[in-house]
Swiss-Prot record:
Function: Component of the dark-operative protochlorophyllide reductase (DPOR) that uses Mg-ATP and reduced ferredoxin to reduce ring D of protochlorophyllide (Pchlide) to form chlorophyllide a (Chlide). This reaction is light-independent. The NB-protein (ChlN-ChlB) is the catalytic component of the complex.
Protein's name according to its UniProt entry: Light-independent protochlorophyllide reductase subunit B
Subunit annotation: Protochlorophyllide reductase is composed of three subunits; ChlL, ChlN and ChlB. Forms a heterotetramer of two ChlB and two ChlN subunits.
PANTHER family assigned: LIGHT-INDEPENDENT PROTOCHLOROPHYLLIDE REDUCTASE SUBUNIT B
Family: Belongs to the ChlB/BchB/BchZ family.
């Protein structure tokens, strides 16, 4: 959550953390999904991609390399939406460098 907040990406839902059945109706509002634990959420993410065209990132952001890969994949998805919405593209490389510089 912290990394997404640092990157200026609002979080729609965190399932199952504090989620309820009532909250599930808002899932299709997300631009993309994050599946940090494939064994728990991959089937749901695959369903949402198939039914609603919502892509997902399934890299667990643990360790330097996987965190960098996670942020790179998020960047690609955000930039895909930026081109659709005619908004400015983002570049998270500096964020990745700052997060991994002293590790």
């Amino acid at each position: 959550k912290r990394s997404l907040r640092d990157l200026g990406i609002p979080v729609n839902q965190i399932i199952p953390e504090g989620g309820s059945l009532k909250d599930l109706k808002d899932l299709p509002r997300a631009w993309f999904n994050i599946v940090p634990y494939r064994e728990v959420g991959l089937m749901t993410a695959t369903f949402l991609e198939k039914e609603y065209g919502m892509p997902y990132v399934s890299v667990t952001p643990m360790g330097i390399l996987d965190t960098a890969e996670f942020i790179s994949q998020v960047e690609k998805l955000v930039n895909a939406w930026a081109s659709v919405l005619s908004e400015e593209r983002v570049n998270y490389m500096l964020y990745i460098q700052n997060q991994t510089r002293f590790v």
